[in-house]
C-alpha cells in the first residue's frame, strides 16, 4: 500500500469530492440542455411544417406549383437559420416543388416501400433532422379507417418534408459545455484555496512538532513545540512538551545514577583486580596441588599394586596347601579383600591418568564380536553366581572388523555390567549392541546394558557421574566400591568421541547406554565358520529365559536351520531332531547328573545334543560328554561359541575328508621354519602325509642357508624367532635368484585384524594362523602347488572351527584333533610340552623373586606356541594374556597374579597329562 504524506491525503480528500460533484453536475446540466435544445428545434420545425401542410392543400388540389413554390420559399427565407430545404411530394411520392434545388431532394423522399406518414414524423441523420407531415384533403375525416394503401387513398394529396440543420444547436451545446467547464474549474480553484489554507493550518504545526520530536530524539531534551495552535493540535503540542520535560527529568536522574554506578563499579573493579591476582595465585597453588595429588595417586597406586599382587599370589598358593576349614575361610576372605583393594587401586590409577590427560587410547584393528564375547564370558561367572541371566545380543548389521581400543571398550562394558550385577538381586542383565550410523570409514555403535535391579532414585541421579560419589551413601557400605567406575566410564566414552546416558526407575531397574565411534577395518582376516552344511537340518531349542532365547534365536535366524523353539522341555513337540540345544537356567543349582532321565530322553530325540550351561555347571561338562552330550556351551550363547558348535555337528557327520584331486602325495618340496620344536615336529608330521619332500629348519639363518642350496615350491615361515625373525628371513630368501617367485606363508599365533596386511606388505604371500589345522594346511598346499595357479578354484572340504572349552586344563580330544587324529603324535606333542615346562617355571620363579630375568616374553611366546598343539586351552589363553600385556608395556611386577596362576596351571597340566601319558 502506497504511503502518502498528510498534505497529499488532505488534498485528495478536499479535491476529490469537489471534482466528482462538479463533474456529475456538469454532465447532468450539459445532457439536459442538449436534449432541451433538440426538443426546441423539433418544436420550431413542427410550427413551420404543420401550418404549411394546411396552406398547401389548395395548391396541391389544383396542382399549382407556382403558388406552393412561393409559399415554401418565403418560409425558407424566414427560417433560413435552421431550415436547409422544404420539399413537397405528390401522392405518387414524386417531387412536386422544393425550396433549395442545390440539395439532393432524394434524401428527403420516402422510400418506395415506406407508407405515407399519417401524422408528423421526425428522423435524424447526423447533423440533419427531417420532419414529414401529410397533405390531406378537407374531405378526409380522421375518424375514417385508413386504407391499407395510403398512396392510393383519394384524400392523401402528398406530404411535406422539412430538413433542419442541427449545427446551430451543436454550437449552442458547445457553449453550454464550455460554460460548465469554466464553472467547474472555478469551483476546483476555490477548493484548492481552501485546501491549501487548511493544510497550512494543519501541516505546519505538525511539521514543527515532528522537528521538535526529532531534536528530542537526538538528545536535545530542552527542545519545545512553540506557536499558537487550535484544538487537538494544541493538546498534542502540550503532550509533546510534557513528554520532553519528563524525559529530561528522567535523563538527569539516570545520568546521576550512571555516574554513581560508574563510581561504584570503578571501586569494584579495583577490588576485583586485587581478587583476581589472589585467585590466580590460588589457582596456581590448586593446580600444583592437583598435579602433586595426581602424581601421588599414580605413584602410590603403582607402589601399592606390587606388594598387593604378592599378597594375592601367595594367598592362592597357600590355598593349595593342606588347611583347616577356618584357615581356608580366612584365606578366602583375604583373597577377596585383596582383589577388591586391587580393583580400587586400578580405578584410582585410571582416574588419575584421565585427570592428568595422560591416558592414551590405542587404535588397533580388532574383531568386535570376539572382544565383547570375551568380556561377557569373564563377567558371566559373577552374574551366574548370583542367579542372574546375562545375555549379549549383537545385531547382524553391526560391522565386526573395526579399529579402536579393545581393552578400554572391555573396561567400559566391565564397569557397566559389573554395576548391574552388583545392584541386581534377580532377573536379567541384557546387553544390546546396535549400529547407529555407518559411513565408508567409520561406524557409530550403541551399547545398551539393561538390568532389573534396585534402580536409582531421581534425586540421586544427578550425582551419578561425580568422582568418589555414589547415588546412596549406604551403597558403599553394602556393595563396596569407590564411586569411580562410572566417572572413568564416562571419560573413556568421551575420549572415544561418544556420550553416555541412562534411564532408571526405583525397584524396576536401570538402562545405561553409550555411543562410541570406531574406524572400519576393510580387511577381513578371520571369518566365521560356514553354516551351509546346516541347510535342511532341524534344531530343537529349549530355553526358559525369554531374553536369552530371543538372543539365541536372532543368531539362529542367520543360519539355514529350521528352528523349533519351546520355553520348556515338556512343551517341546515330540519328534526326532537333527540337533537339540537345551538351555539350563542359571537359577538351577542341582547337579545335572541328577537329571539323568531328562537328558537321556533328550539324547534319544536328537542326533546331536548341546547344553547351554551356566558357569557353575561347567564342572559337569566332561562327565556329560561321556554320557553322550555332543557339546557343552557356556552361557551366554554368542555367535563365536554357538556357530562352531553347530558346524561341529557337520564334522561328526563326515567320517573322512573329501578326496583331494590327487590320491598320492603332492609333488612339492616344502620347507617349514619354526624355532619351537613342538611346532616344528607337528608341521613336519602333517607335511609328511601331504607332500613328497619336506625340509625342517629351526631358525631363520638355517632357512636362508637351506634356501641357497635348493629351490622350494612353498615355505612355511614362523614370524617371531630369535636372532632373525620370519620377515627378515623372507626378504633374504626372495633376494636369491632361484627363490624370487617362491611363495612364503606366514605362520603366527597372532590372529589379529591388521596383522595379515602387515605381513603381506612385508613380502609374505599368504597367512596361516596357529594352531595349524590339517584341513587348512591341505587347502593351502592345493592352492600353491606348482601348475595350479593361485587364482584357480580347488574343490576342498569344508573347514569347521574347533569347539574349545576355554576353561579346560587338558582337552585330549582337542589334542588329537590338532595332531590330525594321530595318537602317537599327540602324545609326543604333550610330552614335549611337559619337558619344556621346567624351563618356563624357572624363569617365572626368578621373576617372582625380583631377579627380572631376560627373555621372559620370548619364553612365554614359545610356551604359547607349544600350548596351541597340545590341547591345553586354559594355559594357552593365559600365555596369550601374559604375552599381550608384556608386549603392550605392562611391567613384569604388575603381572604377578597372572604368573602365579600360570605356575598353578602348569601343575594342573602336568597332573592331567600324567593320566594320559602314564
Swiss-Prot record:
Domain of life: Bacteria
GO biological process: response to acetate; response to formic acid; response to hydrogen peroxide; signal transduction
InterPro entries in the cross-refs: CheY-like_superfamily, HAMP_dom, HATPase_C_sf, His_kinase_dom, HisK_dim/P_dom, HisK_dim/P_sf, Histidine_kinase_BarA_N, HPT_dom_sf
Stretches that traverse the bilayer: 10-31, 177-196
Topology Cytoplasmic: residue spans: 1-9, 197-918
Sequence ranges assigned to domain HPt in this UniProt record: 822-918
Listed GO MF terms: ATP binding; histidine phosphotransfer kinase activity; phosphoprotein phosphatase activity; phosphorelay sensor kinase activity; protein histidine kinase activity; protein homodimerization activity
Gene3D superfamilies with a match to the protein in the record: 1.10.287.130, 3.40.50.2300, 6.10.340.10, Histidine kinase-like ATPase, C-terminal domain, HPT domain
Keywords: ATP-binding, Cell inner membrane, Cell membrane, Kinase, Membrane, Nucleotide-binding, Phosphoprotein, Transcription, Transcription regulation, Transferase, Transmembrane, Transmembrane helix, Two-component regulatory system
Subcellular location, record wording: Cell inner membrane
HAMP domain: residues covered: 200-252
EC identifiers of the protein: 2.7.13.3
Membrane topology classification: Multi-pass membrane protein
Mutant phenotype after disruption: Inactivation of the gene leads to hydrogen peroxide hypersensitivity.
Name of protein: Signal transduction histidine-protein kinase BarA
Amino acid at each position: 500500500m502506497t504511503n502518502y504524506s498528510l498534505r497529499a491525503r488532505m488534498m485528495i480528500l478536499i479535491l476529490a469530492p469537489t471534482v466528482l460533484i462538479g463533474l456529475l453536475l456538469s454532465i447532468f446540466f450539459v445532457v439536459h440542455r442538449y436534449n432541451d435544445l433538440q426538443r426546441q428545434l423539433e418544436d420550431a420545425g413542427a410550427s413551420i411544417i404543420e401550418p404549411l401542410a394546411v396552406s398547401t392543400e389548395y395548391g396541391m388540389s389544383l396542382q399549382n406549383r407556382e403558388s406552393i413554390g412561393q409559399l415554401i420559399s418565403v418560409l425558407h427565407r424566414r427560417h433560413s437559420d435552421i431550415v436547409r430545404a422544404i420539399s413537397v411530394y405528390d401522392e405518387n411520392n414524386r417531387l412536386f416543388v422544393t425550396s433549395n434545388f442545390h440539395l439532393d431532394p432524394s434524401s428527403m423522399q420516402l422510400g418506395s416501400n415506406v407508407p405515407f406518414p399519417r401524422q408528423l414524423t421526425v428522423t435524424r441523420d447526423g447533423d440533419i433532422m427531417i420532419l414529414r407531415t401529410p397533405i390531406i384533403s378537407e374531405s378526409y375525416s380522421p375518424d375514417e379507417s385508413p386504407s391499407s394503401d395510403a398512396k392510393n387513398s383519394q384524400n392523401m394529396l402528398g406530404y411535406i418534408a422539412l430538413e433542419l440543420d442541427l449545427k446551430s444547436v451543436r454550437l449552442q451545446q458547445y457553449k453550454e459545455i464550455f460554460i460548465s467547464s469554466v464553472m467547474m474549474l472555478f469551483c476546483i480553484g476555490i477548493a484548492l484555496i481552501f485546501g491549501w489554507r487548511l493544510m497550512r493550518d494543519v501541516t505546519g504545526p505538525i511539521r514543527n512538532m515532528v522537528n521538535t520530536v526529532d531534536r528530542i530524539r537526538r538528545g536535545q531534551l530542552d527542545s519545545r513545540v512553540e506557536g499558537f495552535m487550535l484544538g487537538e493540535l494544541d493538546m498534542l503540542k502540550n503532550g509533546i512538551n510534557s513528554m520532553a520535560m519528563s524525559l529530561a527529568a528522567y535523563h538527569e536522574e539516570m545520568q546521576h545514577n550512571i555516574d554513581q554506578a560508574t563510581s561504584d563499579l570503578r571501586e569494584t573493579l579495583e577490588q576485583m583486580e586485587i581478587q583476581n591476582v589472589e585467585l590466580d595465585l590460588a589457582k596456581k597453588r590448586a593446580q600444583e596441588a592437583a598435579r602433586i595429588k595426581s602424581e601421588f595417586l599414580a605413584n602410590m597406586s603403582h607402589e601399592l599394586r606390587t606388594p598387593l599382587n604378592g599378597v594375592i599370589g601367595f594367598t592362592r598358593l597357600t590355598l593349595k596347601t593342606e588347611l583347616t576349614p577356618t584357615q581356608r575361610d580366612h584365606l578366602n576372605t583375604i583373597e577377596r579383600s585383596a582383589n577388591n583393594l586391587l580393583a580400587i587401586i586400578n580405578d584410582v590409577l585410571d582416574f588419575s591418568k584421565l585427570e592428568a590427560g595422560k591416558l592414551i587410547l590405542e587404535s588397533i584393528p580388532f574383531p568386535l564380536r570376539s572382544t565383547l564375547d570375551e568380556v561377557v564370558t569373564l563377567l558371566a561367572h559373577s552374574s551366574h553366581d548370583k542367579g542372574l541371566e546375562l545375555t549379549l545380543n549383537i545385531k547382524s548389521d553391526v560391522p565386526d572388523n573395526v579399529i579402536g581400543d579393545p581393552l578400554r571398550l572391555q573396561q567400559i562394558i566391565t564397569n557397566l555390567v559389573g554395576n548391574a550385577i552388583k545392584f541386581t538381586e534377580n532377573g536379567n542383565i541384557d546387553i544390546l549392541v546396535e549400529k547407529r550410523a555407518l559411513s565408508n570409514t567409520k561406524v557409530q555403535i550403541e551399547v545398551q546394558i539393561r538390568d532389573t535391579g534396585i534402580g536409582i532414585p531421581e534425586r540421586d541421579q544427578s550425582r551419578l557421574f561425580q568422582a568418589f560419589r555414589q547415588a546412596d551413601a549406604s551403597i558403599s557400605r553394602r556393595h563396596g566400591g569407590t564411586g569411580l567406575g562410572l566417572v572413568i566410564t564416562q571419560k573413556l566414552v568421551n575420549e572415544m568421541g561418544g556420550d553416555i546416558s541412562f534411564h532408571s526407575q526405583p525397584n524396576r531397574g536401570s538402562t545405561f547406554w553409550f555411543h562410541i565411534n570406531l574406524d572400519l577395518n576393510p580387511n577381513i582376516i578371520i571369518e566365521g565358520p560356514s553354516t551351509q552344511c546346516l541347510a535342511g537340518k532341524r534344531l530343537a531349542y529349549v530355553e526358559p529365559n525369554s531374553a536369552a532365547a530371543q538372543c539365541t534365536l536372532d543368531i539362529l535366524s542367520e543360519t539355514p536351520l529350521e528352528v523349533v523353539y519351546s520355553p520348556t522341555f515338556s512343551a517341546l513337540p515330540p519328534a526326532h531332531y537333527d540337533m537339540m540345544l537345551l538351555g539350563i537356567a542359571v537359577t538351577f543349582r542341582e547337579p545335572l547328573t541328577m537329571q539323568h532321565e531328562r537328558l537321556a530322553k533328550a539324547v534319544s530325540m536328537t542326533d546331536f545334543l548341546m547344553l547351554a550351561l551356566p558357569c557353575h555347571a561347567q564342572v559337569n561338562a566332561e562327565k556329560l560328554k561321556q554320557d553322550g552330550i555332543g557339546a557343552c556351551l557356556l552361557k551366554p550363547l554368542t555367535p563365536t561359541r554357538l556357530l562352531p558348535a553347530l558346524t561341529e555337528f557337520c564334522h561328526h557327520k563326515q567320517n573322512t575328508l573329501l578326496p583331494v584331486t590327487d590320491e598320492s602325495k603332492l609333488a612339492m618340496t616344502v620347507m617349514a621354519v619354526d624355532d619351537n620344536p613342538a611346532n616344528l615336529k607337528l608341521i613336519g608330521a602333517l607335511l609328511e602325509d601331504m607332500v613328497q619332500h619336506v625340509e625342517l629348519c629351526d631358525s631363520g639363518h638355517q632357512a636362508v642357508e637351506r634356501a641357497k642350496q635348493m629351490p622350494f615350491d612353498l615355505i612355511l615361515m614362523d614370524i617371531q624367532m630369535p636372532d632373525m625373525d620370519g620377515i627378515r628371513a623372507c626378504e633374504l630368501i626372495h633376494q636369491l635368484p632361484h627363490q624370487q617367485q617362491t611363495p612364503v606363508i606366514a605362520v603366527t599365533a597372532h590372529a589379529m585384524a591388521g596383522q595379515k596386511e602387515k605381513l603381506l606388505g612385508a613380502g609374505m604371500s599368504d597367512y596361516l594362523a596357529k594352531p595349524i589345522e590339517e584341513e587348512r594346511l591341505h587347502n593351502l598346499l592345493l592352492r600353491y602347488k606348482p601348475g595350479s595357479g593361485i587364482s584357480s578354484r580347488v574343490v576342498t572340504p569344508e573347514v569347521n572351527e574347533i569347539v574349545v572349552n576355554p576353561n579346560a586344563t587338558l582337552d585330549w580330544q582337542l589334542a588329537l584333533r590338532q595332531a590330525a587324529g594321530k595318537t602317537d603324535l599327540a602324545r609326543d606333542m604333550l610330552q614335549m610340552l611337559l619337558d619344556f615346562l621346567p624351563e618356563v617355571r624357572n624363569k617365572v620363579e626368578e621373576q617372582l623373586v625380583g631377579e627380572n630375568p631376560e627373555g621372559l616374553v620370548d619364553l612365554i611366546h614359545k610356551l604359547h606356541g607349544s600350548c596351541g598343539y597340545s590341547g591345553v586351552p586354559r594355559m594357552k589363553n593365559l600365555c596369550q594374556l601374559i604375552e599381550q600385556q608384556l608386549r603392550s608395556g605392562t611391567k613384569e611386577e604388575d603381572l604377578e597374579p597372572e604368573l602365579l596362576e600360570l605356575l598353578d596351571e602348569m601343575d594342573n597340566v602336568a597332573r592331567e597329562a600324567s593320566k594320559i601319558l602314564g
